[in-house]
UniProtKB/Swiss-Prot annotation:
<dbReference type="InterPro" id="IPR036897">
    <property type="entry name" value="CarbamoylP_synth_lsu_oligo_sf"/>
</dbReference>
<dbReference type="GO" id="GO:0006541">
    <property type="term" value="P:glutamine metabolic process"/>
</dbReference>
<feature type="binding site">
    <location>
        <position position="208"/>
    </location>
    <ligand>
        <name>ATP 1</name>
    </ligand>
</feature>
<dbReference type="InterPro" id="IPR033937">
    <property type="entry name" value="MGS_CPS_CarB"/>
</dbReference>
<keyword id="KW-0067">ATP-binding</keyword>
<feature type="binding site">
    <location>
        <position position="298"/>
    </location>
    <ligand>
        <name>Mg(2+) 1</name>
    </ligand>
</feature>
<feature type="binding site">
    <location>
        <position position="300"/>
    </location>
    <ligand>
        <name>Mn(2+) 2</name>
    </ligand>
</feature>
<feature type="binding site">
    <location>
        <position position="752"/>
    </location>
    <ligand>
        <name>ATP 2</name>
    </ligand>
</feature>
<feature type="binding site">
    <location>
        <position position="777"/>
    </location>
    <ligand>
        <name>ATP 2</name>
    </ligand>
</feature>
<keyword id="KW-0055">Arginine biosynthesis</keyword>
<comment type="pathway">
    <text>Amino-acid biosynthesis; L-arginine biosynthesis; carbamoyl phosphate from bicarbonate: step 1/1.</text>
</comment>
<dbReference type="InterPro" id="IPR011761">
    <property type="entry name" value="ATP-grasp"/>
</dbReference>
<feature type="binding site">
    <location>
        <position position="748"/>
    </location>
    <ligand>
        <name>ATP 2</name>
    </ligand>
</feature>
<dbReference type="InterPro" id="IPR005483">
    <property type="entry name" value="CbamoylP_synth_lsu_CPSase_dom"/>
</dbReference>
<feature type="binding site">
    <location>
        <position position="834"/>
    </location>
    <ligand>
        <name>Mn(2+) 4</name>
    </ligand>
</feature>
<feature type="binding site">
    <location>
        <position position="832"/>
    </location>
    <ligand>
        <name>Mn(2+) 4</name>
    </ligand>
</feature>
<feature type="binding site">
    <location>
        <position position="298"/>
    </location>
    <ligand>
        <name>ATP 1</name>
    </ligand>
</feature>
Length: 1072
């Protein structure tokens, strides 16, 4: 049937900020859905409070609201825009939960808005654990023994009858939030108690553990006419018990017999039909390795992380098709955009193997528990495509950017066998490398299978890789051996390491033997039909299917997997760069390996190479394509770190030169430049050893700010207050960046200010100046930032402009540059310069309307800003305010210090925008989970150094009518100052916190970092029980200011289109 006649305007709910469990895959699917609806002539209204995604650009949806997706706000948008339908199944758990609330509040009926795609009844049946269990039993599909509980006592009764281990899964949550595996009563009580608080409906499922069974997933599509197809089967390398988001996943499933495959495929189709899901759906099964017995684990009645992986693995655009199904189209009426010939009612066929490996944040949080289980901890993932499992796995490993180019890691090889065997027995982020090492030490495959429950098929494949390592080690690098190694997926660098030679020697030998990669197309149909899209992967010793043409083209290097410090902001920049190249008539080529992102969609660039971002892989593509040059400024530190080696291999870098990048990244060279330019910088020095560091500390005094070179997200950056802290730090930092100097600066206790600019080497355009709410010493990615800056004098603003121009010209920047300043007592200091796209480019582009990435691309290609219609200097500031708030995923990462510091910890961000400053700040606080009520109970536990400053805070709290509670030392100090507070012990405060007694906690850390520290426990409890936590007095003061002055009903709900119209009037006099 054709699309619904009465649907001409659709409201799409976006997924909000990037958090563990709900990352960029929803931005990718949401973006694809918006484009898909517009293709059908539907007007699209979007609600999403994430400024970092391309989805919230006005190019994607027709009308964009960067507002918090709450029932109250969305009702206002519905009343204003009057959409005919609402699409919620592409916004992750945020979208689903909101759709259910809107329906239950009667808002959809009140405004006659049709819920498109899957109905609320179907969502509830899939998401509510008890309803789901009943539905499966009704259709004869097996589910594990389980009980839905709303209290701890019922969970303990179930445990008494069925024994341990048990798996706990809360209803209506994502990424396994609040779930876990309990092995005894104590663990069960703890997990269920927390899970009940995390569940939107106060329910958890307690089920008999199927730990050790195979976990198999099917991605299925269904339309309103009951047509169904399976898109892809996927197999988890790790058995049941590890969250699929934390598991290595292979597509198609590798170890199923044809009987097992058909059995689970039939069950998948039966389930999607019974649930009446319209669109995409992910079904997870547990399969007994010893029989054909299986259980249905769960169903996601929406596009999910696995859907994004299945889309990229097959080339079948699930979200695009799901959006068309939602407005009434049938699968056989929708064209497959990859082949251009077949319809979407066509099951994809794969003639290659896809491997996904999660990217965990443990390089940032080396104190956290590295074990993985039912609660997800990965921030992102990589995907690789090859012709065999071995080659696909090795390609994925080197895409992770964890300094692993194969399965041999020095840190693992130095471990004792007993330790290796212990680490194999528990799932953790390094288990793949431990298993490889066990195989090297001739540990029996049966034993490893028995301990890990990983299928022997996978273990035999790992054994093949280990045997190949041995063959390389023991023989001359003949043509045959090199060919065999390359075909198995070994990188030049790994072969060089095994042989103890240089990577370039292997590359030279490989070329001498005539061993080059061949490139293949992803076409959804195993080459049965010709592909019209350019979605490419490499392999060895096969026919090359990819033709190159002698036309102007440019390679954009992507940013790889999402991790803390390098999020989707960089994917936003890569996508904008590809579009800008297309506009100039130059063919755009992207190299990236992240299956969650828009940049790796089959039609974003003219050509997509789904490959690791390593020197070898980039050089191979460069030599094949022969482009005008390569752009590294949009791919974050991933691309920047490759620049030196690319230049050595005569690759032309478009934009700022490597020499300039090196000056800004090398702290010593950069300091010298600032001195020459007569620009203020914090006093400091450079240390290569602990002794150097001690000498500098003696000269400068404490506190000090210490950081290594060439890192992102402030990795390993700390504020140190004592000599011992400094010694411990330098020892660790030299491991992160060996041979690179450690920068030691005198800490400046001032306001932090940030600028993004576009430079053509002569003219410098500054779209705006952002001011941080928190003082220096908090990483810029973790600060609340305000645009336009509110507390700078005219003289300070002029100095910031002058310094930005001086530095941009001295470095001959051709493109984007980001500069961070500290301002103290009227003096402006330069803290850091990044001559590339920064994480604030998307939010500043949206706030000001300046197309920063487009200008940077044009400038890199040789144009001048004046030719493009822009003058230098500071762009007129907006008459509205934008506030960027960080969003953290700390509840998923146990034993991690949550207080703000120089090292970045946030996984995402949200934006508050309003005609008033207080309104924008209020929205930002609410979106970041830091909304405090106008009255309530506030707990304070303050470090001694902050006592004085806390007095004015407490006076403000009391004047606003809050009840003050304080821990002993804090309360005692307040008493001395004549301030009344209810005083209690920390242990009692933590107990009350768990029971939801307090409305907010203010805790500035003393020592921090140590899990046995009482303050650490207080902060962790606040995070785990979702109580607003403030670890900076600056943030809570700003929050009180917003809460006390804002009339919530008076907040403006304007679209970005309306804000941009307001700003256009502002700039008329500046544009040439």
């Amino acid at each position: 049937m054709p699309k619904y006649k009465d649907i001409s305007k659709v409201l799409v709910i976006g997924s909000g900020p990037i958090i563990i469990g709900q990352a960029a895959e929803f931005d990718y699917s949401g973006t694809q859905a918006c484009k898909s609806l517009k293709e059908e002539g539907v007007q699209v209204v979007l609600v999403n409070n994430n400024p970092a995604t391309i989805m919230t650009d006005t190019d994607i949806a027709d009308i964009v609201y960067i507002e918090n997706p709450t029932v109250e706000v969305v009702e206002k948008i519905i009343a204003k825009e009057r959409p005919d339908g609402i699409l919620a199944t592409l916004g992750g758990q945020t979208g689903l939960n909101l759709a259910v609330k809107l329906k239950e509040a009667g808002i959809l009926d009140k405004y006659n808005v049709k819920l498109l795609g899957t109905s609320v009844e179907s969502i509830k049946t899939a998401e509510d654990r008890e309803l789901f269990k009943r539905k499966m039993q009704e259709i004869g599909e097996p589910v594990a023994e389980s009980v839905t509980v709303t209290n701890v006592e019922d969970a303990l009764k179930f445990a008494k009858n069925y024994g341990y281990p048990l798996i706990i899964r809360p209803a209506y949550t994502l990424g396994g939030t609040g779930g876990g595996i309990a092995h005894n009563d104590e663990e069960l009580i703890s997990i269920v108690d927390l899970g009940l608080k995390k569940s939107m409906v106060g329910e958890v499922l307690v089920e008999k553990s199927l730990y050790g069974w195979k976990e198999i997933e099917f991605e299925v599509m269904r339309d309103a006419a009951d047509n169904c197809i399976t898109i892809c089967s996927m197999e988890n390398f790790d058995p049941v018990g590890v969250h699929t988001g934390d598991s290595i996943v292979v597509a198609p499933a590798q170890t199923l017999s044809d009987y097992e495959y058909q059995m689970l495929r039939s069950a998948s189709i039966k389930i999607i039909r019974a649930l009446k899901i319209e669109g995409g759906c992910n079904i997870q099964f547990a399969l007994d390795p010893q029989s054909h017995k299986y259980y249905v684990i769960e169903v996601n009645p929406r596009v999910s992380r696995s859907s994004a992986l299945a889309s990229k693995a097959t080339g079948y655009p699930i979200a695009k098709i799901a959006a068309k199904i939602a407005i009434g189209l049938r699968l056989d009426e929708i064209k497959n955009p990859v082949t251009g010939k077949t319809t979407a009612f066509f099951e994809p066929a794969l003639d290659y193997v896809v491997t996904k490996i999660p990217r965990w944040p443990f390089d940032k949080f080396y104190t956290t528990d590295r074990r993985i289980g039912t609660q997800m901890k990965a921030t992102g993932e990589v995907m690789a495509i090859e012709r065999s499992f071995e080659a696909s796995l090795l390609k994925a490993v080197r895409s992770l950017e964890i300094k692993a180019y194969g399965l041999r890691l020095d840190s693992v090889r130095g471990m004792g066998t007993k330790e290796i065997l212990e680490d194999i027995s528990v799932p953790n982020d390094m288990r793949l490398f431990y298993i490889a090492e066990a195989l090297r030490r001739n540990i029996d495959i049966d034993y490893i299978n028995d301990v890990t429950k990983i299928d022997k098929w996978f273990l035999n494949k790992l054994s093949n890789i280990v045997n190949m390592e041995k063959e390389i080690e023991e023989n001359e690098l003949s043509k045959e051996i090199l060919k065999k190694a390359k075909r198995m997926g070994f990188s030049d660098r790994e072969i060089a390491t095994i042989k103890g030679i240089k990577e370039e020697d292997v590359r030279t030998l490989r070329k001498k033997y005539g061993i080059y990669p061949s490139y293949k197309m992803v076409d959804t149909c195993a080459a049965e039909f010709e592909s019209i899209t350019q979605y490419i992967y490499s392999t060895y010793c096969e026919e090359d299917e990819v033709e190159t043409h002698d036309i102007p083209k440019v390679i954009v290097i992507g940013s790889g997997p999402i991790r803390i410090g390098q999020g989707i902001e960089f994917d936003y920049c890569s996508v904008k760069a590809l579009w800008a190249l297309k506009e100039t008539g130059i063919k755009s080529i992207i190299i990236n390996n992240n299956p969650e992102t828009v940049s790796t969609d089959f039609d974003t660039g003219d050509r997509l190479y789904f490959e690791p971002i390593t020197l070898e892989d980039v050089l191979n593509i460069y030599e094949k394509e022969k482009p005008l040059g390569v752009m590294v400024m949009f791919g974050g530190q991933t691309a920047i770190n490759l620049t030196e080696e690319l230049v050595k291999n005569e690759v032309k870098i478009l934009g700022t030169s490597f020499k300039s990048i090196d000056i800004s990244e090398d702290r010593e060279k950069f300091s010298k430049l600032l001195k020459e330019l007569n620009i203020n910088q914090p006093k400091g020095g450079y240390a290569l050893t602990v002794e150097d560091a001690k000498d500098i500390a003696l000269k400068l005094g404490f506190p000090l700010l210490v950081r290594p070179s060439y890192v992102i997200g402030g990795q390993s950056m700390e504020k140190v207050n004592t000599l011992q802290e400094l010694i411990d730090y330098v020892k660790h930092a030299t491991e992160v960046s060996p041979g690179k100097p450690v920068l030691i600066d005198k800490y400046i206790d001032g306001r932090e200010v940030e600028v993004d600019a576009v430079s053509d080497g002569e003219c410098v355009l500054i779209p705006g100046i952002m001011e941080h709410i928190e003082r220096t010493g908090v990483h810029s990615g973790d600060s609340f930032s305000i645009y336009p800056a509110r507390n700078l004098t005219e003289r300070e603003i002029n100095t910031i402009i002058e310094y930005t121009e001086k530095i941009s010209k001295a470095l001959n920047v051709k493109g984007l540059i980001n500069i961070q300043f500290a301002v103290k007592e009227g003096t402006v200091y330069v803290l850091e310069v990044n001559p590339r796209a920064s994480r604030t480019v998307p939010i500043m582009s949206k706030a000001t309307g300046v197309p920063m990435v487009k200008l940077a691309v044009e400038v890199a290609l040789g144009k001048k800003l004046k030719e493009l219609g822009y003058k230098g200097g500071l762009w007129p500031q907006t008459p509205y305010t934008v506030v960027k708030a960080p969003v953290f995923s700390m509840e998923k990462l146990t034993d991690v210090e949550v207080s703000l510091s120089p090292e970045m910890k946030s996984t995402g961000e949200i934006m508050g925008i309003d005609l008033s400053y207080e309104g924008a700040l209020y929205k930002a606080l609410e979106g970041a989970g830091l909304k405090i009520p106008k009255k309530g109970k506030i707990l304070l536990s303050i470090a001694e150094r902050d006592f004085q400053e806390a007095v004015s805070l407490v006076e403000k709290l009391q004047s606003l009518g809050y009840e003050i509670y304080a821990t002993y030392r804090t309360g005692k100090y307040f008493s001395l100052m004549g301030i009344h507070a209810n005083i209690m012990s920390l242990d009692h405060a933590i107990k009350l916190l768990k029971n939801g007694y307090f409305d907010a906690v203010v805790n500035t850390p003393t020592k921090g970092k140590k899990p046995d520290n009482a303050g650490f426990k207080l902060r962790r409890t606040a995070v785990e029980y979702r109580i607003p936590l403030f670890t900076s007095i600056d943030t809570i003061k700003a929050a009180l200011n917003a809460v006390s002055k804002v009339n919530v009903n008076g907040l403006s709900v304007l679209s970005m289109n309306e804000y941009q119209e307001i700003q256009k009037d502002n700039v008329k006099n500046l544009v040439l």
